A protein has these predicted regions:
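Acidic, glycine-rich A-domain
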Residues: 1-300
């Protein structure tokens, strides 16, 4: 059957039984170890920037804390319990972050390992900073039956089909999911590359989830090794990808492309970082993430 939008799939990554889950957790730890030195440095830098922007205030009417004599002298005389105040800190980063990883066949081998490590570096650096973070991966589903059905269509009807393959969207970590619960799923990422990449449609799918968040600032990072590639007819897939990126921006999402050993992302995104080796994380990649989250460079 020729593709219909309802055939796109959204599924949480399955880590299987306890033995497989343990194996994926070990894979995560290996990847984390590869970026460990950078993660520690980046976390300290991010914390410094965020703390400098945080707003601190005192909230009264508490039953414990510091005695608020100035505002509650009458209540103190009356022996009321709500005469204390507590120091509250409002996070400087009221931002939700979505990371979308191209997991097509061309990303196999060293590229998906680098994408996994880049993703883990961000997850670990932001862990504990109260930044809602979602990690998604996408590729098309290979189906010879759908492809054959498309080719059997009359030429005029074939031109009406913009995309033959459906999209498989994998959830590695939810916005409100603790990182500790997602590590096994992220550890499996390197084993899941397949098919092609319908970047534009996948970006829109991820963006709609991000748009549902209540945080005033929304940021999306798209990790990819190249250009979109999938079967279709009535669509210029390159222009379509650019149109989707533009639509995301018009709907209040700041979007950036991270090129994995490729500069092709420069064709589709205004904000771009190209990473060719793991050592680039602590400079180019992480600094761009910091600027997106805080509006400031880590070097400031």
């Amino acid at each position: 059957r020729v593709f219909a939008p309802s055939e796109d799939k959204f599924e949480e990554v399955d880590t299987g039984n306890s033995e497989r889950s343990l194996r994926y957790r070990r894979a995560y730890q290996v990847a984390k170890g590869a970026v460990g030195p950078q993660v520690g440095t980046v976390r300290r830098k991010l914390e410094r920037v965020m703390m400098s922007q945080a707003q601190t205030f005192w909230e009264g009417g508490k039953r414990s804390g510091r005695l608020d004599v100035r505002r509650n002298s009458k209540k103190i005389v009356e022996l009321r319990p709500d005469v204390f105040r507590r120091r509250q800190e409002e996070s400087a980063v009221n931002t939700a972050l979505s990371i979308l990883v191209d997991m097509s066949g061309s990303m196999s081998s060293s590229k998906i390992f680098m994408a996994q490590r880049a993703t883990i570096a961000i997850c670990e650096a932001l862990d504990g900073m109260r930044v809602p973070l979602e990690v998604l991966g996408h590729h098309t589903a290979a189906s010879s039956a759908m492809q054959d059905a498309w080719y059997r269509l009359p030429q005029d009807r074939r031109k009406m089909v913009s995309r033959v393959q459906s999209i498989d969207m994998h959830l590695f970590k939810g916005f409100d999911e603790p990182l500790s619960m997602a590590r096994a799923k992220l550890g499996r990422m390197t084993q899941m590359t397949d098919g092609a990449n319908a970047d534009g449609d996948a970006i829109v799918m991820a963006a709609k989830r991000l748009m549902a968040r209540r945080e005033p600032r929304k940021v999306m990072l798209v990790l990819s090794d190249g250009e979109p590639a999938y079967t279709g007819y009535n669509r210029n897939i390159h222009n379509h990808t650019r149109d989707c990126v533009k639509w995301v921006g018009e709907n209040g999402i700041e979007i950036a492309g991270l090129g994995i050993m490729s500069a092709s992302v420069t064709k589709y995104y205004d904000r771009v970082v190209v990473v060719n080796k793991i050592e680039d994380f602590a400079t180019t990649y992480i600094d761009e993430v910091a600027k997106l989250l805080t509006g400031r460079s880590l070097s400031t």
